[in-house]
């Protein structure tokens, strides 16, 4: 087993998430199991910062990270492929290109001016769509026009395009 890259200590959030602790090592897949209503989704959302946590500590590569919202989690390399892709994972009225580029603007438009490097964006989108074999006529089609499986591929590809350290999949 590799080094510990992700750790949650004593996470509490609402009535469903009580004293959750676990570690994930490099290359390891960790599952959170439980019956429907056991708090799996609530746990993932609290870790990602989509819902507030009352207490607990989150560590990435051995360093405590402060996650007050999804932007903090993304910056720390922790991302979420949510249970409801249409509601929480995609902007269905936007193109596949935009869905991949939007969460990666910090990588595509570095610097004070915030100008998107279109060549870098095109390369990122091309690699992401080819790696995941997203079936579509082109990257300009609305995400809503894709099949459910291809929509899910867009959700995952946008996060892997930024080389995230930890990807949380909620069902």
Can you annotate each of these PLM segments?
Residues 1-171:
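Glycine-rich phosphate-binding loops of nucleotide-dependent enzymes
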